[in-house]
C-alpha cells in the first residue's frame, strides 16, 4: 500500500470511529510518523477508549496491507478551553507539514482539515466548524421547505 493509501485508510477509520463514539473532530493533520487530532470528548465513552479503538482498527488494517507501524506507543493530550487556544492549536497543526519541509504552504498538504477551514470543502472526515454549522442550517431550512411527504 502506498503512503497515500495508508492516509486514506486512516481517514476512513477516523470517520468510522468518530461516528461510532459520537465525538467532534475540530481538526486533524496526518504526518508521516504521527497524527495531530483536535477532538471533543465522545458522547458514548471516554476519549481514551475511542482512541484505543481507532489505533487498533487502523493498525490492524495497515498491517494487513503491509504498511509499517504508524502509531507511537502513547498519545499526548492537551485540554483546549477557549476559542483562542483552539485557533492556536489548529494553526500549529496545519503548519506542521510546512515546518517539516513536506510542503511550502498548508493548503498543499492533502491529509489535513486545512482545506475545510479555507474553503468549506467536505472531505472524508466531518469537521465541526462554522462551515459545518452553516451547512446543517441550510439543510434544515431546505427540509422545512419541502412538502411533508417529501421529507426523509
What are the residue ranges of the model-derived segments?
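Short catalytic/metal-binding and nucleic-acid-binding patches
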Residues: 1-152
Amino acid at each position: 500500500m502506498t503512503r497515500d493509501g495508508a492516509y486514506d485508510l486512516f481517514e476512513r477509520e477516523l470517520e468510522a470511529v468518530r461516528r461510532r463514539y459520537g465525538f467532534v473532530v475540530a481538526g486533524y493533520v496526518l504526518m508521516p510518523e504521527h497524527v495531530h487530532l483536535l477532538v471533543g470528548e465522545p458522547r458514548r465513552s471516554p476519549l481514551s477508549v475511542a482512541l484505543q479503538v481507532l489505533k487498533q482498527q487502523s493498525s490492524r488494517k495497515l498491517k494487513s496491507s503491509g504498511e509499517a507501524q504508524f502509531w507511537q506507543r502513547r498519545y499526548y493530550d492537551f485540554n483546549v478551553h477557549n476559542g483562542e487556544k483552539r485557533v492556536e492549536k489548529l494553526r500549529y497543526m496545519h503548519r506542521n507539514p510546512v515546518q517539516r519541509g513536506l510542503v511550502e504552504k498548508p493548503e498543499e498538504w492533502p491529509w489535513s482539515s486545512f482545506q475545510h477551514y479555507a474553503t468549506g470543502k467536505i472531505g472524508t472526515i466531518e469537521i465541526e466548524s462554522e462551515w459545518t454549522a452553516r451547512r446543517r442550517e441550510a439543510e434544515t431550512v431546505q427540509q422545512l421547505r419541502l412538502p411533508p411527504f417529501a421529507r426523509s
